[in-house]
């Protein structure tokens, strides 16, 4: 027998009251985006659960994708059979013979949403349990905590059987907590910060600063590949490439070396905030971890934050590097993050950066530059690409855009 569908149960949605259907619809769309790499799979959702109809797709591959989607508590692969007692008996026997191992206990759990069916739930449990004893004479029934709990559901259109429950990712459906702009450098920390924001339902857009010719096409692709890894948790993500060469050259020419990193980060924060405003974001998210590098001391954070009133979320701020690496390996971003491409935060990094920069000093050095003009030109030059779980589709779309 082949699985016909996957029954998906929701996570924290039960607490959302009147907004429940908005959350469910968002989760359905996220599941559809993530499973778009399996064209034959169709997804539906109602108030109680969602269903992914396999239509011949490989269950194992689809299940691996579903495990990553935030907002799912658990799911079960399901067999669909004709709504007939004899067909059900045969199906139950086949399933049990396939999964039973010596010494296992079992239980039949039946329920009917179609109350016109010829047997009620108790009678169905007895009838199907008897069929199991016929097929496996030595099997033992056990009502509490059996090894196999074979669930049977009678609906109007058919009967459905399942015995396995797979744990989901939990969290909230991506997009139900508003939008945030993720400052994505290409290192280890920022993708992990993005992942943790996604888990709490934040719809992220990835803002990446590129400084060609100092940064290479490889560095840009690395950031896009990291973004693609994050799409498996909630669907498509907008990738925003910001031209940053002019600003970095201006900072290098007009500011002392000790303040290069502080001023660079202040410009990045201004630009990200401007993009956030245009694209209706609510917060800025970054991968800063307290004390990890010179720009991540409390004094540096204060000096950099001074250019915006927008809330800055730092999901990894209290984590040790090894804790961050553990998550990066778990979500499969680590190997990409350590690829040897320099990003714009490292190309002009000073040997001895200021660890306790003063806001008044930063403002004094910025007064030598046309700050507003530099920011406006950078924002005007952004390029936006929608990153999907399907790399080939993105590449074809980019090719078409280039031709046009």
Curated annotation (Swiss-Prot):
It catalyses: [ThiI sulfur-carrier protein]-S-sulfanyl-L-cysteine + a uridine in tRNA + 2 reduced [2Fe-2S]-[ferredoxin] + ATP + H(+) = [ThiI sulfur-carrier protein]-L-cysteine + a 4-thiouridine in tRNA + 2 oxidized [2Fe-2S]-[ferredoxin] + AMP + diphosphate; [ThiS sulfur-carrier protein]-C-terminal Gly-Gly-AMP + S-sulfanyl-L-cysteinyl-[cysteine desulfurase] + AH2 = [ThiS sulfur-carrier protein]-C-terminal-Gly-aminoethanethioate + L-cysteinyl-[cysteine desulfurase] + A + AMP + 2 H(+). Its EC number is 2.8.1.4. This is Probable tRNA sulfurtransferase. GO terms for molecular function: ATP binding; CCA tRNA nucleotidyltransferase activity; tRNA binding; tRNA-uracil-4 sulfurtransferase activity. Its main location: cytoplasm. Catalyzes the ATP-dependent transfer of a sulfur to tRNA to produce 4-thiouridine in position 8 of tRNAs, which functions as a near-UV photosensor. Also catalyzes the transfer of sulfur to the sulfur carrier protein ThiS, forming ThiS-thiocarboxylate. This is a step in the synthesis of thiazole, in the thiamine biosynthesis pathway. The sulfur is donated as persulfide by IscS. ATP binds at residues 183-184, 208-209, 265, 287, 296. Keywords: ATP-binding, Cytoplasm, Nucleotide-binding, RNA-binding, Thiamine biosynthesis, Transferase, tRNA-binding. InterPro entries: Rossmann-like_a/b/a_fold, ThiI_AANH, ThiI_fer, ThiI_N, THUMP_dom, THUMP_ThiI, tRNA_STrfase, tRNA_sulfurtransferase_ThiI.
